[in-house]
A protein has these predicted regions:
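C-terminal (or distal) subdomains of carbohydrate-active enzymes
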Residues: 1-192
Length: 192
């Protein structure tokens, strides 16, 4: 079975708690192990300054000049059935709106998130920060025909379909996407 309230969604495998103000996940607990994977906030949407770069940001290895974040959010349950439950989170930054649909299925141990961004900012970029509770993490990311593991050194790296941030015991958090091809990881914070 799966259920949702205004700020949480859960099934027999996972419980996710959403911070209404930021729209980020503040707890992501694996019910089988009791482990919480969320650090401060998983999926916090930040704004970085991009005024000094050319169109393609040649020779730039980091985009970490954080100047703001999305906020003023609201959450609402839009689906709460026996097979799937979904929470809609809406946050804003100036004229930009970021909507996320967090869904859990009754027999899945994955949290599904669909995102929709109306970004109306000049010389700025938006990044999603996945701050985990992992200690001394390493990062593995997908590349054509394989994967590669690197230290979490805050440099932008190409990544195609997925990224995995894990501790030395192999316990970690995987993020699968179909639309963005770059990320950076700094300590236990992974940014896409």
């Amino acid at each position: 079975d799966v259920s949702a309230g205004k700020n949480y969604i859960e099934n027999r495998f996972l419980r996710a708690e959403i911070d209404e103000e930021s729209g980020a996940v503040i707890k992501l607990t694996d019910k089988r192990s009791g482990k919480n994977f969320a650090g401060e906030k998983l999926g916090r949407a930040i704004i970085c300054n991009d005024i000094k770069n050319d169109t393609w940001a040649h020779a730039v290895t980091e985009f970490n000049d954080e100047i703001g974040s999305f906020g003023g959010g609201k959450c609402e349950v839009i689906e709460n059935g026996p097979i799937r439950a979904t929470i809609k989170s809406t946050v804003k930054y100036n004229n930009s709106v970021f909507i996320r649909y967090y869904s859990l299925y009754s027999e899945s141990d994955s949290l599904f998130v669909k995102c929709r961004l109306d970004f109306d900012e000049e010389y700025k970029l938006m990044k999603l920060c996945f701050e985990t509770a992992l200690q001394e993490p390493s990062v593995t990311y997908s590349m054509p025909y394989g994967s590669i593991e690197k230290d979490a050194n805050s440099q932008e790296e190409p990544s195609h379909a997925w990224t995995d941030i894990h501790d030395r015991n192999g316990v970690g958090l995987g993020i699968i996407n179909d639309g963005k091809y770059s990320f950076c990881a700094c300590g236990n914070d992974r940014r896409r």
